[in-house]
Amino acid sequence: MTSNAIRGIRRKKSSLCEVKVAVIGAPGVGKSALTVRFLTRRYIGEYDHQSETRYKHEVLVDGEPILFEISDTCPKSDDELPSMDTLQWADGLLLVYSITDRGSFNFVRKAKEALAVADPEAAMPLALVGNKADMVHLRQVSTEEGEILAKDFECWFSEITAAEQVAQVAESFHELCREVLAARRRNKAILAEPNARQ
């Protein structure tokens, strides 16, 4: 490989669009399963991690190469909301609850409230995911409740199952990426307006 070709590869890598996603949810909702499914296309049902884990993953979203940095958060209890550091680090939040756990649904509502208190002016891109949709016999949260919450949050929503739906899991991350990129374009346009410079 020539040195020009190597420089071209380096240039391409450095021009990758980076998107930082924090996966937020109560313990046991399948945050790690969703994240690993997205990263590797494999499903692993049991995880035992005691701290936040970060991953990097390059993928095409709508034909554009994106470097995802994903923070798989690890709250110790239903009362432990995302830290300010996590909220400030992230470009977007993937809020995950289990359709089989009413408490986890309430957790994502509280997490969103914490975000609003932390920065009332922020318009953090969000996506809401109801995981474990294959376990309808244990359902505690209706699809309609998820849709209403997503409408309140003004965000994309889907019910999925990390155990079975590779494409839908990827689409959750891709949709959040689209929201992050759209927010960046809006912010850039606002800064470019003549009145914004004064």
Predicted segments, located by residue:
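Post-kinase regulatory C-tail/linker adjacent to protein kinase catalytic domains
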Residues: 189-198
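TRAFAC-class small GTPase G-domain
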Residues: 1-187
